[in-house]
């Protein structure tokens, strides 16, 4: 079965890098669920739309459709040149973590108040090599993490809220 991946990041700021990353993943045989297209409808607007997005849908509906594609992927890769993450990508990362889906990052996100273990910061070449190994299995960011941040994040997701 073909592995699936979604690539997220600031399409407004870094679409070229994101599309190059998508092409690398396609070249090793992965199916890229999201983004579905490389063609941006209008440059410079706050919420980027692609030509494959239904024109009649609101921005919120487009985002929800994208999240459906993202969350049904085997893993997600966040392309963050210079650590830039952006508002929409922050939102997506939060939903991905809450859904216990595997996510990896090209660079450590700046201005992002979640602990990212070093093992989840991997460049595209290293992640591609891992994905070509049949026995490699992507993990959720907090799987097996027993430090304070990992325990607190796991408790949040499980609805076991701390009374500080």
Give the positions of each predicted feature.
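Conserved catalytic or regulatory cores that recognize and/or transform ribose-phosphate-containing ligands
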Residues: 1-164
């Amino acid at each position: 079965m073909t592995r699936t991946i979604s690539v997220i990041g600031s399409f407004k700021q870094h679409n070229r890098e994101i599309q190059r990353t998508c092409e690398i993943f396609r070249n090793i045989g992965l199916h890229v669920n999201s983004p579905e297209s490389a063609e941006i409808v209008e440059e410079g607007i706050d919420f980027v739309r692609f030509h494959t997005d239904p024109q009649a849908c609101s921005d919120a509906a487009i985002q929800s459709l994208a999240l459906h594609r993202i969350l049904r992927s085997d893993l997600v890769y966040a392309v963050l040149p210079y650590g830039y993450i952006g508002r929409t990508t922050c939102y997506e990362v939060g939903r991905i973590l809450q859904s216990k889906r595997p996510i990896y990052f090209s660079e450590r996100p700046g201005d992002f108040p979640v602990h990212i273990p070093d093992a989840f910061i991997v460049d595209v070449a290293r992640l591609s090599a891992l994905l070509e190994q049949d026995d490699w299995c992507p993990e959720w960011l907090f799987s097996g993490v027993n430090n304070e941040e990992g325990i607190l994040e796991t408790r949040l997701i499980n609805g076991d809220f701390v009374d500080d």
